[in-house]
Amino acid sequence: MNDNIIIPKYKDSPYKKIPNELLNEYTMNGKIPIFDWFLDGRDNLHKKVWDQEYINSFLSKYSIENIISGNEGTSPYGHKICKNLLTSFIDYDIKNKNVAVVGTTSPWIEAMLLNLKNNVTTIEYNVPDSKVDNLQCKDYFNYFKNNKETYDAIVTFSSIEHSGLGRYGDPLNPNGDIEIMETIYNNLLKDGLLIWGAP
C-alpha cells in the first residue's frame, strides 16, 4: 500500500475503465490482470423503502424454524449459507444485541438478526429508507466511517470484497477493502464479534 497516493473521490463511479493514476495500485504494479467486465450496481437495492409489510415478508421467510428445516425458499446464496449464518448467530449468542449489517441489497441477514431480537443497523452506500422501529439504515460515508457508537457484532456477507471498486457508486479506492475492515474494527466493542463471509 502506497501511503503517498492521494485518492480523490471519483463521483462518476462506477467507471468503465480504471483511471490511469490508480492502475498500478489496483493491479499491484501490473501483477494482477485486468478483465473488461463492467457492472453498475447503484440500483441493485431490491426495494428502496423498507416498510413493515416488506420486512415482515423477510421475517417470515427467514424464521429460525424455516432455516433449520430448510424451508426458507430461494435465498440469495442458498440454504447452506443461511443455515451457517444462523448457526453462527446462535452459537456466539448474537441475541438481544446491537448489531450492524454492512452491505445489502435485500434484508435477508437483517431478518435473521431481527428474529433473534437484535436491534439492527444496515450500513450501505445506497441507503434504503427503513420504516421499522428496530431497523435503522445509515450511509457508510456520512455515518459509519465517522461513527462514535460501537456494536456488539457486525455482520457482512459478499460486500467487503467490492469496496473501493466503484460498482455501487462508492468512490474508487484500491485499498477500499482494507479501509472498510479498519472502519468495522473501529465500530466494534472491545469484545465485539465480526461475522464475515464471501461466496
PLM feature spans:
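A short glycine-rich, Lys/Arg-flanked "PGG" loop and its adjoining helix->strand segment in the class I
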Residues: 172-193
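Residues that mark the start of a beta-strand
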Residues: 97-98, 150
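A short hydrophobic/small-residue beta-strand
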Residues: 120, 194-195
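Class I SAM-dependent methyltransferase SAM/SAH-binding core
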Residues: 100-145
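Surface-exposed cleft-lining segments at the edges of enzyme active sites
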Residues: 66-73, 162-175
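Short strand-turn motif at the edge of the Rossmann-like AdoMet-binding core
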Residues: 197-199
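A short acidic, Gly/Pro-enriched loop at the edge of an enzyme's catalytic core
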Residues: 143-158
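N-terminal accessory regions of S-adenosyl-L-methionine
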Residues: 1-95
